[in-house]
Amino acid sequence: MLARAPPPYFNFPARNNTICNRNEIVRLFRNGGGVVARGAGFTRRPLETSSSYDDSTDDGFVIISAADKENEFAPPPSSDLLSSIPSESARRNGSRSRGLTASFGRLKAQKVKALVGKVTQKKQHMSHNEEEDEDDASDENYSADEGFGSSSILDLMRKKLAMKAIPRSGKSAERNEVKRASKVRESRESRRDLDRLEGDDEDVDEVSNPDRFTDNQRAGSRSSYSKGGYAANSRGKGDRLSVARDLDSFEGHGRAIDEVSNPRKFNDNERAESRSSYSRDSSANSRGREDRRFVAKELDTFQGRDKAYDEVYNPRRFTDNERGLRGGSHSKGSDTNSRGWGDRRSVVYTRDMDDWRERNKTKDTRETGFFSRKTFAEIGCSEDMMKALKEQNFDRPAHIQAMAFSPVIDGKSCIIADQSGSGKTLAYLVPVIQRLREEELQGHSKSSPGCPRVIVLVPTAELASQVLANCRSISKSGVPFRSMVVTGGFRQRTQLENLEQGVDVLIATPGRFTYLMNEGILGLSNLRCAILDEVDILFGDDEFEAALQNLINSSPVTAQYLFVTATLPLEIYNKLVEVFPDCEVVMGPRVHRVSNALEEFLVDCSGDDNAEKTPETAFQNKKTALLQIMEENPVSKTIIFCNKIETCRKVENIFKRVDRKERQLHVLPFHAALSQESRLTNMQEFTSSQPEENSLFLVCTDRASRGIDFSGVDHVVLFDFPRDPSEYVRRVGRTARGARGKGKAFIFVVGKQVGLARRIIERNEKGHPVHDVPNAYEFTT
């Protein structure tokens, strides 16, 4: 059995989806220019089957008819037969058997003779021009250099014989004639010249007189083109239709460009139908219709005539259902998108339009934008809970509260993420407490000594005290339940006594929680829900890994887990979805974003270019800037963030030297060097005081940025630039909190920090997140 030579290894061009750069389109329109048509880009990939080789049409590719393919160009045999053909080096070494060598030589000789004889007969009634003779000469020189024993001999002979058998007129004399396809990348100018030489064909008339042809006629002609034999019509009608499609796309004579220049003539259904029909077209129509639809879509997007872009500048024309439907289409993506990190088209970014609109609204409009359009009754709050919230002056839920209520009260594990000051504490407390109260009234569950029904883990004792204050406010307003805090710095005996009396909600830090679990004092057999507040900070605690493992191993399988955070970095998100793959992800509208009411000011403290750059000179420049801000913008409350405790103490000394008797300036330190009692006292004084004559300054480290709600803060000063962009969001988020909050942030930077801070502020001004957020499920509010 003789082995057949393998076919040549050809590539065919695949259409590239993009014909031009989007950023360049935007720049051209902003500068008053127009879109310049560019040649479509192509990528190449190897063919997988022999049949696909016959369908290839690129520079120098050969189109083989059915009869020729059966006779001269037979498809290759199976892989085992091809593997029996030795390489050229093996032939030189004589390692191949003599019988196979002789058989293979006779096979090639017979094939070559058959090809030469057939082509010689065909050449008698074929005309050739000078250009073809030059190509033949070049091919002869090239093939003469190759040895007959080369593995690519049939490939070279095919090209040579096929090029000699190609008539330039584009008209077929015989059905089985071997033709050469026109070059895909041939310029449009030459194609137009060719069309003019061939006369007023119907296809050319369609380009020059588009009004004479309806869309059905134009579509029918292109459909017939795609269904016809491309090998026979590639030089004639195929080229003319390619010109027609190019002119339709870039010169404005087609329906797609008319749709761009006259958008009012087309409704949304017609535009959607046209784009849907594009997706159903054959590959032969991709050159024309794809270009027209893509250009139309690009121009619609960047000129403001697309529905998505029009939604930004004309928000009143779109209802919440329409906007939610657009966002929901993103959430139905693949597993990769739901668990990955998205670009501008992720689910979370569907709400960016609301943020851009809010920046141009007045103060009163901005206040209403903080709350959801739904009421507490509409999201499912009970009468007792609504009464308790009403007493605390909560009339409507915030966005994150409305979004998280339904999955939390249903007992689903969730990741709840939104910006600082958005109301995340009540977003998980209200539904959890309501569910506990309903279960207690129905007799399904009840608190027992040493076994709380809800555990809240927080990173700091100050945040634990804040959560406890919220729990007691709800309890005193008509929804009774018991809550307590177990943290370091308090008498342990008192905490244990209260725990033995029975508690519904236990708030603890990871260290104290681990201690109670190891000592056997705390039991989790009755646990209904575990809440991890500021989970991104908890993962940075050395004791948290052990605390989380104890929590998972000791709690019932039916326990609910809630992970709450203002920032959700990639590594934290991956850890959560790996351990809890069934979590619902509730993303607020402003994750990783600063408040709309926040004003940011970049202060370059690098000094003069000729001055010496040292840490001491940088500190002196920051000191001068701080005193200048204090004198020119006197306010009631200011928080100053430093990276180190040592820097905090230096800043404290600056204020003490300015006002030793603290008649106008009152400084309150807040960092780990102080005892917990001192920190809580200073925090309480700073949050509850309303000074009228003097100004309060809280000098702190990042400990104060971890979830603590500082109400009424006017200014935030970043004396040291944060090491992490996520920390930037938490620091500046201490001001401009809530619906009516507003404030200013002054960022001191030196050296390379200037460029990084400028990019962050520019992104904030545009409403973009400081860094990406994951694609996730989202609930309509």
Swiss-Prot record:
Alphabetized UniProt keyword annotations: ATP-binding, Helicase, Hydrolase, Nucleotide-binding, Plant defense, RNA-binding
Entry's Gene Ontology BP terms: cellular defense response; cellular response to ethylene stimulus; cellular response to jasmonic acid stimulus; cellular response to salicylic acid stimulus; defense response to fungus
Binding site for ATP: 418-425
GO CC entries: chloroplast
Keyword field contains RNA-binding: yes
Compositional bias segments (type: Low complexity): 79-88, 275-286
Enzyme class name: hydrolase
Catalytic activity reported: ATP + H2O = ADP + phosphate + H(+)
Domains (record comment): The Q motif is unique to and characteristic of the DEAD box family of RNA helicases and controls ATP binding and hydrolysis.
Family of the protein in this entry: Belongs to the DEAD box helicase family.
Protein's name in the database: DEAD-box ATP-dependent RNA helicase 50
